[in-house]
């Protein structure tokens, strides 16, 4: 947790000439009393191709810092045009406003800066030699890029970040981990057994359903066979009535026999018909 929090930055003179100083109104909050001062620094990026052209415009120490919300104005001199490549004097660059505590940077704010000529004729026809007096800067104050870093403050040290080792604690933790692993394995085995039991129960239920279906099919077939037998018996009784109704002559048995033998060839004789024909 950061003891100092940046609440806001206001650019006071913007736009301005290239040769005018930079001015920022900075507001920050301090949560605890600090042993050291805060160092604020402004850096001008002279070239996008090399760090050699970066210029530290100014740096100040702010302190002692009281607890609560604080505000101050930070002023810095403009960059030296002689240290900037001529091809990058009239272009877009970056300025960096940073704050450090006890040599450790914990916040950095970057702004884009557009440098251009103040006259339309110079913008359309740039002179061979850069005229610094006619360059104006415009800081894009509405779009800062803020970067924060975690550092060690007065109430913190390396020992606080990493608790001391306690003999025997690691062994106990390992044993607890092993017991937890064993418990998890047992639970997994129980779950597997339960799943196997459920699977076997489902299979048994399916087999019972299949057997019940087979039994129902057999019963249905038996009922159909019984109906067929009853129907065949009814047909035989009708046949006997027809045979008995034939007028008898002197040889009644012969007349009955002729009627049966003269029937359709598609009718299959039953054992009863065969027995009747022999009588």
Swiss-Prot record:
Note: Present with 6230 molecules/cell in log phase SD medium.
Outcome after substituting residue 48 to R: Abrogates interaction with histone H3 and histone H4 and enhances transcriptional silencing. Reduces acetylation of histone H3 on 'K-9' and 'K-56'
Outcome of swapping residue 145 to E: Abrogates interaction with histone H3 and histone H4, abrogates transcriptional silencing, reduces transcriptional activation, reduces acetylation of histone H3 on 'K-9' and 'K-56' and enhances sensitivity to HU and MMS
InterPro entries assigned to the protein according to its UniProt record, in alphabetical order: ASF1-like (IPR006818), ASF1-like_sf (IPR036747), Hist_deposition_Asf1 (IPR017282)
Keywords: Chaperone, Chromatin regulator, Coiled coil, Nucleus, Transcription, Transcription regulation
Annotated localization: Nucleus
Acidic residues: compositionally biased ranges: 168-244
Gene field: ASF1
Protein name: Histone chaperone ASF1
Species per Swiss-Prot/TrEMBL record: Saccharomyces cerevisiae (strain ATCC 204508 / S288c) (Baker's yeast)
Variant or mutagenesis effect after changing residue 96 to D: Reduces acetylation of histone H3 on 'K-56' and enhances sensitivity to bleomycin, camptothecin, HU and MMS
Main location: nucleus
Annotated effect of mutating residue 147 to A: Reduces acetylation of histone H3 on 'K-56' and enhances sensitivity to bleomycin, camptothecin, HU and MMS
Region of interest (Disordered), ranges: 156-279
Interaction with histone H3, histone H4, RAD53 and the RF-C complex as annotated region, ranges: 1-155
Stated consequence of mutating residue 94 to D: Reduces acetylation of histone H3 on 'K-56' and enhances sensitivity to bleomycin, camptothecin, HU and MMS
């Amino acid at each position: 947790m950061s003891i100092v929090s940046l609440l806001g930055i206001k650019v006071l003179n913007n736009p301005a000439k290239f040769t005018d100083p930079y001015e920022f109104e900075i507001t920050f909050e301090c949560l605890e009393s600090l042993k050291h001062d805060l160092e604020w620094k402004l850096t001008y990026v002279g070239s996008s191709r090399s760090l050699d052209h970066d210029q530290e415009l100014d740096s100040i120490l702010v302190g002692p810092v009281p607890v609560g919300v604080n505000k101050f104005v930070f002023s810095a001199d403009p960059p030296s045009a002689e240290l900037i490549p001529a091809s990058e004097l009239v272009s877009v660059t970056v300025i960096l406003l940073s704050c450090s505590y006890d040599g450790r940077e914990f916040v950095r704010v970057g702004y884009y800066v557009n440098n251009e000529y103040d006259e339309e004729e110079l913008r359309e026809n740039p002179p061979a030699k850069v005229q610094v007096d006619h360059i104006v800067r415009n800081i894009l104050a509405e779009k800062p890029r803020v970067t924060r870093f975690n550092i060690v403050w007065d109430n913190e040290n390396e020992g606080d970040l990493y608790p001391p080792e306690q003999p025997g604690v690691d062994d106990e933790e390992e044993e607890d981990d092993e017991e937890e692993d064993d418990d998890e394995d047992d639970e997994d085995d129980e779950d597997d057994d339960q799943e196997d039991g459920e699977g076997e129960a489902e299979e048994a239920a399916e087999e019972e359903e299949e057997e019940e279906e087979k039994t129902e099919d057999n019963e249905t077939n038996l009922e159909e066979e019984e109906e067929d037998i009853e129907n065949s018996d009814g047909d035989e009784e009708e046949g006997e009535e027809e045979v008995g109704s034939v007028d008898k002559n002197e040889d009644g048995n012969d007349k009955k026999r002729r009627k049966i033998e003269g029937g359709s060839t598609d009718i299959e004789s039953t054992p009863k018909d065969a027995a009747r024909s022999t009588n």
